[in-house]
Amino acid sequence: MLTPLLNSAVYYLVFGILFQQNRGIYHYTAYLVTGVFIFSFTERSIVTGSTVMRANIALIRALHFPRACLPLAYVMVEFQQLLVSMLVLFPIVLITGEPLTWYWLFLVPVLMLQATFNMGAALIMARLGAGAQDFSQLIPFLTRIWRYFCGVMYSIASLPASLPEWAKNVLSFNPAAVYISLTRNAIMYSQREYAPGAQPYNALKCAIFNTKKIPQLQAYCHPIVTTNQLWLAGIGWAVVTLVAGVLYFWQAETRYGRG
C-alpha cells in the first residue's frame, strides 16, 4: 500500500504540477490516487503471475494439485491488498470534496470484474513465465509502459484534438483504462458531472475546453466511450480473458514442474 501512495506523490509532482495535467480535472488528487491504486492491482497480479510457477517449482514437484491454484491464489492475495488500500483511498476521495453517494455501490461489480480479468491474465502470464525464464524479467518493464497509456495520470478525453479518433478509442478501451474509468465514475461525482457527454453536445464550448482545459465545458464534448460501452468492455475483457487464461494454462497442466 505504501508503494502506490509514494508513486501517487511522485506522479502528482511530475504530471500534476510540472506538466500541469491537473488542468481540466476536478479533484486531481483523488483522480490520480484512484488510477494508481486500480492499475497497481492489475500490474501486481500480472507481474506475480509471471513468476509464480518458477517460484513454487519445489511445491509443484512434491505435490499433486491443480496448478491453476497458484496464480489464482496470488491474485486473491493482491485483491485483499486492494481492499485494504480502499481504506486509504476512500478518505482521500472524501477529503478532496467528492460526496458519498449510492453510486459508490457500483464499485463492488467493478472490482469483481477487474479481479476476474486479473485471474485470466495471471493464468496466461503463469504459463508464459513457466516456459521462458527471462520472460518474468520483461513483464515489469512492459507494465510500466502500459501504465502511461491508461490515463492514470491524465485524462484521455483531454488529449489533443489532433490525435486520431482511433488512437483515443484504443487508449480508452484497453482493459486497465476501462476499470480505472469505471472506478472513477463510481466514487467521483465530478467525473460523472463533467465527463464528455454529461451535457448536450456544444461544439463551441467543447472547443474552448480543448484550449483552456475548463472542466465544466468538457461535459459538452462528445464522449470517447459512453458509460454503457465501458461496462460492456469491462464485462467482455473479464469473461474473455478468464476463459482464454483457463484454457491456455490448462493445456500445459502436465508439463509444469518439468525440466
What are these regions (language model features)?
Residues 1-259:
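Hydrophobic transmembrane alpha-helices and immediately adjacent juxtamembrane helices
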